């Protein structure tokens, strides 16, 4: 789930290792602009809820109903609450203020991404309250988005791989095929 927040910085820091990027339901905030209320609520929930039910959290961010087996699979790595410290901490690593620790590294990444002319595709969903519409920011700032087949995936929440995995896979394959490495 942290592919954009981690992956976009890695791509910016190691441009030579990346030939194309597909960004889905993500953002790379610097804390310079107000975060969506839904994200602030998520941060607060992650810190205050006494029981952090990972499978239920994933399910709540999906449009489709996940099977009990899938929910259990998301819970499986965490045999007890004490094993969820990292999962609880991750939301707090996202900068929401200009002086947060990740703000400057994200700003540096944006300086690279604003010059990124390699293929860059966005595939956002229509039902993610945190990232919905965020693709427009990428389109405006990243030159590599020009001429790509950007899409809004209908009927999907935050976890595209769960709600519309096959559609996302097809988009990915098409993106790779339409932008061969030279």
Residue ranges and their predicted role:
Residues 2-152, 161, 173, 179-180:
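Flexible "cap/lid" subdomain of the alpha/beta-hydrolase fold that forms the substrate-access gate
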Residues 156-169:
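Catalytic histidine-centered segment of alpha/beta-hydrolase-like enzymes
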């Amino acid at each position: 789930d942290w592919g954009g927040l981690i992956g976009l910085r890695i791509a910016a820091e190691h441009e030579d290792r990346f030939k194309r990027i597909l960004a889905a339901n993500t953002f790379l905030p610097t804390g310079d602009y107000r975060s969506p209320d839904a994200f602030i609520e998520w941060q607060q929930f992650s810190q205050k809820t006494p029981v952090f039910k990972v499978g239920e959290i994933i399910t709540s961010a999906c449009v489709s109903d996940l099977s009990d087996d899938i929910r259990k699979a998301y819970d499986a790595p965490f045999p007890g609450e004490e094993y969820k410290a990292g999962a609880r901490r991750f939301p707090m690593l996202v900068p929401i203020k200009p002086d947060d620790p990740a703000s400057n590294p994200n700003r540096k990444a944006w300086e690279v991404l604003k010059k990124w002319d390699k293929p860059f595709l966005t595939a956002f969903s229509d039902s993610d309250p945190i990232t919905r519409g965020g693709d427009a920011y990428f389109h405006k700032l990243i030159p590599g988005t020009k001429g790509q087949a950007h899409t809004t995936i209908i009927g999907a929440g935050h976890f595209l791989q769960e709600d519309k995995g096959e559609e996302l896979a097809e988009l990915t394959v098409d993106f790779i095929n339409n932008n061969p490495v030279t």
